[in-house]
Each structure stands twice: as structure tokens, then as C-alpha cells.
Amino acid sequence: MITLIAAVAENNALGKDNQLLWHLPEDFKRFKALTSGHYIIMGRKTFESFPKPLPNRTHVVISRQKNYQPEGCIVVDSLEKAIEVCPKEEDVFVIGGGQIYKQSIAIADKVDITRVHHSFEADTFFPEINLDEWQLVFSEFHPKDERNQFDFTFQTFVRK
């Protein structure tokens, strides 16, 4: 199963200058719980935005740079090759960035979103979720608090 996972603003903003636009510890906790022990597919810039590789996950990085080989990662030059290197029986998570989401939404089985209830100026956006193709099967609202600076909702969509 291929799942897209992302934190997305009301205007579908993902980030700016290769950085997230908010700090939501509850979102990080959910991301870790869902992706731990699985293959995660990402673009090079998304990988480079992490201070170090994420523990307990197999990193598949998509890059067109020929000699790009960060330690402990599988590097491929296309989304198709990224999917091919992941075991078929595994749950695979696509974790960004914007172009990788745009390419992969057509082949995804599921989308796990943290919808941040605010709009931001951004340079990277998540593709529209077409409700003719996707069904919302889970929604859980969380008000902002001392640790999470914005209201947000965990949402899960499955392909119809």
C-alpha cells in the first residue's frame, strides 16, 4: 500500500525555503508512529531538510544527481524506481516534497494528512485532494495548546 503523509495548511502549503511553516509536536508523534519500521520515499531536498536520517525507517531518496549517495539510503532517479525497490507487501510512505507528492498522488492508495487550520505564504504545496476520487474515513480535530501553535485535524483518505 502506498500512503502519502503530510502536514498541510488550509491553502495546501507545505513549506517555504525547504522548511516547515509550523511546529506541531502531535503531528511529529503521529508521523513517527505511522512511518516507523517502513520504507519512506522522498525527494533529495526533503531528505536534506532533516538534521540526520530518521531512525527505524528505510530511506528511499529520489535524485537526478548522478553521484548523490548519502550514507544508509537507497538512491534512485525516479518515482517508479523508488516504488520498485520497496517490497510489494510493505506499507510504503511518500513523505515529500511537493513535486514527489504531485507525481505520486495518482498511484497512492491512501492519504494521511494533518490539516493545519491556518494559511501560509509558501513555495511548496500539496496537490488538491479530489473528493470524487478520495473518501474521508477518519477525522480528529485538535485545538491549539501550549505545545501546538495552531488548531489542526488528523485526516485519512482512501481511494474510492
Predicted regions and their residues:
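Enzymes that bind and transform nitrogen-containing heteroaromatic metabolites
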Residues: M1-K160
